[in-house]
């Protein structure tokens, strides 16, 4: 089509030039009206009108009939012929090539545009991996994405905060985000700039470890396999491990304890208990020995006083046991585990069923407090109790009977530690115990809760001192149970597989302990 257009334009231009030349040389023969034949444009005006008779020769091809008038076409000149031949040659050679090239480019662009639209509509399938006989899709990698930040972040933050103008705090936050690199750190080996940071983190982590606990393992405390063994031909999913969670202690723990126990202000016992759990390391002791540092640990143990050694092996030690330990000599052996197994015979640890209670023959009532039949330890209770002890390094002793009562509370419709019903649940247990039994059951927890000097004053003989001591020891027992139930409540919702059904967890306003991963 374009070639035909070019030919027509060339013909019109050539005819116009030739006609204009003839008009200048010869005066045209005028007709009846002395007018011109009207055509569209100026070309028609330049062609003269001639009135001719009809040609008698029907084969004469030199005339063009137009009604009663006819226009005579002069034979084309040589210049006209050469122009037509030249134009046609260009169109047939280079012109057609240019037209074909332009058409090909247009087709390529349209195909690319169509392909782009199609690729946008159809997502790219992620690669699959065969896991347990099933095809699983790999999740997208966040580090492949680019985080974009708006230029009007301060204004957006001000609008969301419902303030008129961006404050200094909002401007600083926006500036910090704009300069921050949100990309993940590469998984490869760290460079020299990050090596010091990693070393600092490792040093800070090691400060929170007990040096001797790294090498000491109790053969009776085995890690529970959290992966179900009954999963067949499926991708097994391990249950969450509580020891991977961080225990957070509230700053207002003394006031929360006073609120729970119906006190107006926190007592000395509540303040001491809050101080104990704030400084306590809830992480469980590592399992299994480390042969690389056994020798250094042995040398460290024998270079320290005996009282420090006892506190390394077990954080909860009876006062008279420490005195007896100081009179004995610990002989160096080839493995630190021997010292843990030997001391397990007379040093209590933060576990129960022979673990939380000293096994000394002089100690009475080593099986825990007396409870009702419904609160006695069963197979389920012992299983949950063992998992609870292995999940944390407990700040106080925990007996299976106490765990049984806590299980009954957590299975209720109202089980939140913020509810004061837990005090009523433990009331029959605490109020039944007398001073000698409380002293044995609380053990070294008494010194933590009451303080060494206060404990000496309370344990003096006399009826008045006896009543004051009984009241204080019962309060200490309530405080200990309140703290332990908060930790047990968090544990139960992490290990909900132990229970058939639990009510939804309550987001507590007032709390003492919480777990955060």
From Swiss-Prot:
Keyword Secreted part of the UniProt annotation: yes
Species for this entry: Plasmopara viticola
RxLR-dEER, short sequence motif: residues: 50-71
Written domain comment of the UniProt record: The RxLR-dEER motif acts to carry the protein into the host cell cytoplasm through binding to cell surface phosphatidylinositol-3-phosphate.
Function: Secreted effector that acts as an elicitor that induces cell death in host plant cells.
Keyword terms of this UniProt record: Host cytoplasm, Host nucleus, Secreted, Signal, Virulence
Protein name listed in UniProt: Secreted RxLR effector protein 95
Sections of the chain in a coiled coil: none
One Gene Ontology CC term in the entry: host cell nucleus
UniProt family annotation: Belongs to the RxLR effector family.
Residue ranges of the region described as Disordered: 50-73, 351-376
Bias (Basic and acidic residues) ranges: 51-73
Keyword Signal: yes
Signal peptide: 1-21
Locations listed in the record: Secreted; Host nucleus; Host cytoplasm
């Amino acid at each position: 089509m374009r070639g035909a257009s070019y030919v027509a334009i060339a013909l019109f231009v050539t005819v116009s030039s030739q006609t204009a030349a003839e008009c200048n040389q010869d005066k045209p023969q005028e007709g009846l009206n002395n007018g011109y034949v009207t055509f569209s444009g100026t070309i028609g005006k330049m062609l003269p009108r001639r009135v001719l008779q009809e040609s008698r020769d029907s084969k004469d091809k030199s005339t063009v009939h137009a009604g009663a008038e006819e226009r005579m076409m002069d034979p084309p000149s040589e210049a006209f012929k050469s122009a037509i031949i030249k134009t046609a040659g260009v169109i047939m050679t280079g012109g057609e090539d240019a037209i074909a090239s332009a058409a090909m480019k247009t087709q390529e662009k349209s195909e690319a545009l169509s392909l782009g639209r199609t690729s946008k509509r159809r997502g790219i399938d992620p690669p699959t991996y065969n896991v347990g006989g099933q095809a699983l899709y790999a999740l997208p990698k966040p580090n492949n994405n680019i985080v974009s930040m708006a230029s009007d972040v301060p204004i957006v933050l001000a609008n969301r905060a419902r303030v008129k103008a961006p404050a200094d705090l909002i401007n600083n936050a926006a500036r910090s985000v704009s300069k921050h690199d949100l990309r993940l750190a590469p998984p490869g080996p760290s460079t020299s700039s990050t090596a010091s940071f990693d070393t600092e983190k490792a040093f800070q982590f090691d400060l929170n470890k007990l040096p001797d606990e790294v090498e000491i393992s109790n053969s009776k405390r085995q890690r529970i396999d959290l992966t179900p063994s009954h999963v067949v031909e499926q991708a097994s999913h391990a249950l969450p491990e509580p020891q991977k969670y961080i225990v957070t202690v509230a700053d207002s723990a003394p006031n929360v304890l006073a609120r729970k126990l119906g006190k107006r202000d926190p007592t000395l016992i509540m303040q001491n208990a809050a101080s104990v759990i704030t400084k306590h390391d809830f992480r469980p002791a590592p399992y299994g020995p480390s042969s690389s540092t056994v020798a250094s640990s042995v040398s460290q143990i024998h270079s320290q006083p005996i009282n420090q050694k006892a506190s390394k092996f077990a954080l909860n030690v009876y006062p008279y046991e420490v005195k007896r330990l100081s009179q004995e000599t610990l002989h160096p052996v080839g493995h630190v585990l021997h010292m843990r197994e030997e001391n397990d015979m007379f040093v209590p640890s933060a576990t129960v069923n022979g673990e939380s209670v000293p096994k000394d023959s002089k100690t009475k009532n080593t099986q825990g407090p007396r409870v009702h039949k419904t609160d006695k330890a069963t197979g389920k209770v012992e299983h949950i109790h063992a998992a609870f002890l292995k999940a944390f390094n407990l700040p106080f002793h925990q007996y299976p009977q106490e765990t049984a009562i806590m299980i009954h509370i957590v299975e209720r419709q109202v089980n939140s530690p913020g509810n004061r019903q837990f005090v009523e649940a433990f009331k029959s247990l605490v109020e039944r115990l007398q001073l000698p039994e409380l002293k044995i059951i609380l053990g070294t927890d008494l010194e933590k809760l009451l303080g060494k000097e206060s404990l000496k004053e309370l344990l003096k003989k006399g009826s008045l001192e006896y009543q004051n001591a009984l009241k204080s020891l019962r309060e200490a027992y309530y405080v200990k149970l309140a703290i332990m139930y908060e930790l047990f409540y968090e544990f139960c919702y992490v290990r909900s597989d132990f229970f058939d059904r639990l009510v939804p967890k309550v987001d507590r306003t007032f709390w003492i302990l919480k777990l955060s991963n």
